[in-house]
């Protein structure tokens, strides 16, 4: 890989890391190509970016994006995007694949613990939260109309 290619990769990663809420690092040693494709497809559905990068290039990009502090060793795959989506994709994939291990993440201006990553992965998505809210708002109106219909039937009988 030439120096220009490396600089281009670092620039792209820096831009991606800067514009994301979370950067998650996982070990993927032992995963098949098919499993990695599955991870990428799952991530693409929720607009999470996935890339395998050399640790030295990733360290430079993380430092440029002001998200340094993560210790990068061995084989790493990087996921970045929305906090909850990144955590959900990684946690779900970790459950399905023994070879995939979440190592660390950078979110909210600091290196996150594994317990925080797992907790975020269990939160409902934005769409699910909106659906819950609409259901709560709709319940009183629905109960009111049911009551009116019952009253109407009682009076007509």
UniProtKB/Swiss-Prot annotation:
GO terms for biological process: translation. GO terms for molecular function: large ribosomal subunit rRNA binding; structural constituent of ribosome. Keywords: Ribonucleoprotein, Ribosomal protein, RNA-binding, rRNA-binding. It comes from the Bacteria. GO terms for cellular component: large ribosomal subunit. Forms part of the ribosomal stalk, playing a central role in the interaction of the ribosome with GTP-bound translation factors. Belongs to the universal ribosomal protein uL10 family. Part of the ribosomal stalk of the 50S ribosomal subunit. The N-terminus interacts with L11 and the large rRNA to form the base of the stalk. The C-terminus forms an elongated spine to which L12 dimers bind in a sequential fashion forming a multimeric L10(L12)X complex. This is Large ribosomal subunit protein uL10. It comes from Campylobacter hominis (strain ATCC BAA-381 / DSM 21671 / CCUG 45161 / LMG 19568 / NCTC 13146 / CH001A). The lineage of its organism: Bacteria, Pseudomonadati, Campylobacterota, Epsilonproteobacteria, Campylobacterales.
């Amino acid at each position: 890989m030439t120096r220009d290619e490396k600089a281009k990769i670092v620039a792209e990663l820096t831009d991606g890391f800067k514009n994301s809420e979370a950067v998650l690092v996982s070990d993927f040693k032992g995963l098949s190509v098919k499993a990695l494709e599955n991870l990428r497809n799952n991530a693409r559905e929720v607009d999470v970016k996935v890339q395998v990068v050399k640790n030295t290039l990733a360290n430079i990009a993380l430092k440029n994006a002001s998200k340094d502090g993560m210790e990068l060793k061995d084989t790493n795959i990087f996921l970045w995007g929305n906090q909850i989506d990144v955590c959900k994709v990684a946690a779900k994939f970790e459950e399905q694949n023994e070879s995939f291990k979440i190592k660390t993440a950078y979110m909210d201006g600091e290196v996150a613990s594994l317990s925080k990553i797992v907790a975020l992965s269990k939160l409902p998505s934005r769409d699910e939260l909106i659906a819950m809210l609409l259901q709560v708002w709709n319940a009183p109106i629905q109960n009111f109309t049911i009551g009116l219909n019952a009253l109407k039937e009682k009076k007509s009988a």
